[in-house]
């Protein structure tokens, strides 16, 4: 197959295929550079292209799901232009069609989460706490804490979601905590990669990923591009 959709890529298809296979084997850019003979900078550029396609794939599933409007997330077309750098790294976790899904939350703080956990009806109904109906848990990627929202009445089958989200959180922490001083502009890409790897852990990831990068629409997700642009612009300001 042709790998021309890896925009900006200048390597022959054979090398693109090799990088993709080694990416699926979960090797680092340094390891792949040593094996393939391609510079680490170039490998990292391809990593970003691959992760962007994965993020678009995950977001396409979220947007197609017509999630409840009460989900106060930055993933909808209306919210992606918000400035995520000025907000803590909080993500909502929920189960959708048997898969773990994640969404960056733009209007929340630790105090709000604790009030939600404590079922502070007065604060919630009074509007001082944002409503996150539909989420099973909220993850704080600053302090690496997971807050369960088992008091949320808008979520079905909480007990069924418990093992999946617990497994996903362990998987994600083990992958991301090894990064030191991760650029916040790449955090969403890494979280979406974790989401993808966890949800397809029982599948042939190379086959799934090959299908993703051969689909033009996953390289033209305007909502995701706006989201990434907001990260970049805010960091440069």
Q: Whereabouts are the PLM-identified features?
A:
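Residue-level recognition of single "structural anchor" positions
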Residues: 1-237
């Amino acid at each position: 197959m042709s790998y021309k959709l890896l925009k900006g890529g200048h390597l022959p298809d054979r090398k693109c295929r090799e990088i993709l296979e080694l990416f699926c084997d979960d090797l680092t850019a340094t390891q792949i550079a040593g094996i393939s003979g391609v510079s680490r900078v170039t490998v990292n550029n391809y990593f970003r292209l691959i992760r962007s396609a994965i993020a678009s794939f995950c977001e396409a599933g979220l947007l197609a799901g017509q999630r409840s409007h009460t989900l106060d997330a930055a993933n909808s077309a209306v919210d992606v232009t918000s400035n995520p750098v000025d907000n803590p790294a909080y993500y909502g976790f929920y189960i959708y069609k048997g898969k773990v899904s994640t969404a960056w939350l733009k209007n929340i703080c630790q105090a709000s989460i604790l009030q939600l956990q404590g079922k502070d009806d007065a604060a919630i109904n009074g509007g001082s706490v944002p409503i996150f109906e539909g989420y099973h848990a909220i993850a704080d990627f600053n302090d690496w804490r997971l807050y369960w929202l088992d008091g949320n009445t808008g979520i079905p089958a909480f007990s069924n979601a418990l093992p999946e989200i617990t497994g996903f959180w362990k998987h994600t922490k083990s992958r991301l905590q090894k990064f030191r001083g991760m650029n916040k502009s790449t955090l969403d890409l890494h979280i979406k990669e974790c989401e993808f790897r966890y949800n397809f852990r029982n599948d042939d990831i190379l086959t799934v990923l090959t299908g993703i990068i051969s689909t033009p629409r996953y390289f033209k997700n305007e909502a995701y591009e706006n989201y990434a642009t907001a990260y970049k612009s805010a960091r440069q300001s």
